[in-house]
Swiss-Prot record:
Lipidation sites (GPI-like-anchor amidated asparagine): N372
Keyword Hydrolase listed: no
GO cellular component, one term: side of membrane
Name used for this protein in its record: Protein ecm33
Cysteine-cysteine disulfides: none
Glycosylation sites: N79, N179, N199, N205, N210, N221, N240, N257, N321
Gene this protein is translated from: ecm33
PANTHER family per record: RECEPTOR PROTEIN-TYROSINE KINASE (PTHR31018:SF3), SPORULATION-SPECIFIC PROTEIN-RELATED (PTHR31018)
Residue ranges with Low complexity bias: 349-369
Entry keywords, A to Z: Cell membrane, Glycoprotein, GPI-anchor, Lipoprotein, Membrane, Signal
């Protein structure tokens, strides 16, 4: 009995010390050396935020740790070459790396769940050692890295997915991704980037800039914008897409085919402009556009046989010799309710705001391209939709 009298309090005290050594909620733990990291090797779970000191040099490994109940971050660690955590399976908050300019290895073979990913300025990081793959994350932002692919990012759902300025990035295939609750954005990556989202069925906003291929065969509906600027793919197909917000195809130099056979509703503006190789626009199921229809270019055919309601402006101009008869009738029958213009065989086709509708137009409409792009303002938003106007302005700035 006497032994128990003293042993039990001692054991409790030892447990308290061990718990304290594994961090506390809202505490920041600074790791300045491998010995600092080894001090937590007896911890299955570390509580609080782990910050890797920017002055640390070489490799750092977190052995035996399975869970971080906070953030794992490093900012400005210019001499850190490797970060590893062989057994870590979850980071509850943010996995943040910024300015690790010599980092070549990121080894987290057991990691499957992250609160969010924020990686910026990791130019020497060419691949990920994420064997199991991260299948759960809130927002993912990856900017200015040397990654050639995103193998190891195997998300089922995501909030924002923002992939920009990764100039070595050749391919992205997020096979398991089914839903996105925030913006999906690709911009400024390698011009030959191919994006495959084979099982994505729903989302909010999706924007693609300077990509060579986009595959979204399962996409069914978007609540926000779907936009393409300056891409180099020849064909875009969304066979199951029925509804989206603003829809934009702007300055895609090689685009010859747009296939959206199931599209019925555009909740916003619908802009097709400056796609000089596009000769035909066929939208067999389109019924409703709540914003403006604004098509300009070099196309010879335009077909929207089921069109029932265009609430905004209708501008259709092309160098091609198509017929306006169907759309004249739709305007007279009040199917098209806004300001109406349809012009075939127009040498200098323009958008509804006067910007050039082709990349080779000359004369007044060509010079109008810059001035009118610069004049986009809130007065234009109700007809075309905010996101489409914003996208057009961004493309002009770029």
């Amino acid at each position: 009995m006497a032994f128990l009298k003293y042993a039990l309090p001692a054991l409790a005290a030892a447990q308290a010390v061990l718990a304290a050594n594994c961090g506390k909620t809202d505490e920041t733990i600074t790791i300045s050396s491998q010995s600092d990291a080894d001090g937590y090797s007896s911890c299955s779970t570390i509580k609080g935020t782990i910050e890797i000191d920017e002055h640390l040099s070489g490799a750092i490994t977190f052995n035996n740790v399975k869970q971080i109940d906070g953030t794992l971050s490093c900012t400005g660690g210019a001499n850190i070459s490797s970060i590893a955590a062989p057994m870590l399976n979850s980071i509850a908050d943010t996995f943040k790396l910024d300015g690790l300019t010599t980092l070549t290895t990121l080894s987290f073979p057991s990691l499957t769940s992250v609160g969010s990913i924020q990686w910026t300025a990791l130019p020497q990081l060419q691949s990920l050692d994420f064997t199991k793959g991260v299948n759960e994350a809130g927002d993912v932002t990856i900017t200015n890295t040397g990654l050639a692919n995103l193998n190891g990012i195997s998300l089922n759902t995501v909030g924002k997915f923002d992939i920009t300025e990764n100039t070595q990035l050749k391919s992205i295939n997020i096979n398991n991704l089914k839903n996105a609750t925030g913006l999906i954005n690709f911009a400024g990556n390698l011009n030959s980037l191919e994006v495959e989202l084979p099982n994505l069925s729903s989302g909010t906003n999706m924007t693609f800039r300077n990509v060579s291929a986009v595959s979204v065969p399962s996409l069914h509906n978007l609540t926000g914008q779907l936009g393409f600027w300056g891409d180099t793919f020849k064909s875009f197909s969304a066979p199951n897409l029925t509804e989206t917000g603003d829809l934009v195809f702007n300055s895609n130099s090689k685009l010859t085919n747009i296939s959206m056979p199931a599209l019925e509703t555009v909740n916003g503006g619908f802009l097709i402009t400056r796609n000089d190789e596009l000769s035909s626009i066929d939208l067999p199921s389109l019924k409703v556009v709540t914003g403006a229809v604004d098509f300009s270019g070099k196309f010879d055919e335009v077909s929207m046989p089921k069109l029932e309601n265009v609430k905004g402006q209708f501008n259709l101009q092309s160098t091609g010799n198509f017929s306006c008869d169907t759309f004249d009738k739709a305007h007279n029958d009040k199917v098209i309710r806004g300001t109406y213009k349809c012009k075939a065989a127009e040498p200098n086709p323009t958008t509804k705001d006067g910007s050039s509708g082709t990349t080779t137009s000359s004369g007044s409409s060509a010079s109008a391209s810059k001035s009118n792009a610069a004049d986009l303002n809130a007065a234009n938003l109700p007809a075309l939709g905010f996101a489409a106007v914003f996208g057009a302005l961004v493309q002009y700035v770029l």
